[in-house]
Amino acid sequence: MASLSLGNLPVNDPAYVRKVVRTVVRALDNVIDLNFYPVPYAKITNHTYRSIGLGVSGYHHMLAKNKIKWQSEEHLAFVDKLFEQINYAAIEASSDYAKEKGSYRYFEGSDWESGAYFEKRGYCSDEWKELREKVHRQGMRNAYLLAIAPTSSTSIIAGTTAGIDPVMNKYFLEEKKGSMLPRVAPDLSPETYWYYINAHHIDQNWSVRACGVRQRHVDQAQSMNFYITNDYTMRQVLNLYLKAWECGVKTVYYVLSLIHI
């Protein structure tokens, strides 16, 4: 797995995003061949399907830098467009590498070959139709492409926010391996301050809706958390899970609660 650091990428430059995605897809595919497999069956599975996990981190960082409020329709529209671009670039890259190196073993008869993958997601623009034809003609190097990891540790090194989660606070202490690390919202300034809403202050329905929007473009799963307070009832928590299911979200990672003092 690897993650695009969205808060540190010029996400409004499609050509640059495409270039980075293509590079990461090639790198992840190479890892499959170079990796050490202590379990033989893991090697068999990896070489059969050649699945990779291209994900993201710095999601809230990106929104704040672009002055987009988490609880807004602008947020949903922005990430719908961005993740479609990322997915398009990843599929295009995998198909091109299939032409260069060969498709994964079970491409024939798959949703990729039949075009069902594109139909299920409503990818029907002329640009997507061209890519669909290319995939049918050239094949796919990888059976699965996108998966979003938590990145709670690696995001610290990258100086950005974790995965697709909102920040816990503009400033907080986080325990890592027995040590307390001070965390400050990246690029915090008078301009970005108002776009960093604490995770537990966010209406979780907005987070669920955003996850559903992204899921259309993510063929695997997303590390998505619920942030609730002790004011939540069991019915409200259940409703969040039902909402996630209705939005097509595949998984929910943790339910992180906060007690009001």
Predicted regions and their residues:
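Alpha-helix initiation and N-capping motif
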Residues: S3, P14, V25, V56, ...
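Catalytic alpha/beta core of large soluble enzyme barrels
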Residues: L28-D33, Y117, R121, K134-R141, ...
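Short, contiguous, pocket-lining structural segments
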Residues: V20, S51-G55, I86
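Conserved short loop/turn motifs at secondary-structure junctions
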Residues: K43-Y49, L76-E84, N225-T233
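Function-dense linear segments that define catalytic or interfacial modules
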Residues: M1-N46, V56-N66, T160-T161, V167-E191
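Internal maturation/activation junctions in enzymes
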Residues: V21-K43, K69-T151, L240
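Hydrophobic/aromatic-rich, well-ordered segments within soluble, folded domains that form packed cores
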Residues: S51-K69, Q236-V249
